[in-house]
Amino acid sequence: VDDLKGKKVAVEKGTASHTYASKNLSDADLEVHDTITTAYESLEQKKVDAVIQDGPGANFYIKTTPDSNLEVVGDEFNQGQAPYCVAISKECKYYDEINAAVKVLIKNGTTDELYAKWCE
């Protein structure tokens, strides 16, 4: 993160990365985007020097964007985030079924496989 001093850094508005950058990168020129896609487009077009996003999201973007020559660099840093989750209303008629299915996916290793495929 210290390497970003004096650099132009893009973030998505309203995200944990936006909050983190606002608090911790006072020496950087922060560029706030409405979407993470436009932040990455600015990086591809060399309009910014870096994008800050959570690791799984960054890795997913890179893996699923044809012709992207981006890569995740530097050490990961904690933005105070909790692990990823599935959020549904407790009033959803499939609430119990969804919870049971997620528990099965965790237990049988499917979530680990998906994470390795899309987020590493």
Regions found by a protein language model. Name each.
Residues 1-120:
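Proline/Glycine/Serine-rich low-complexity intrinsically disordered segments
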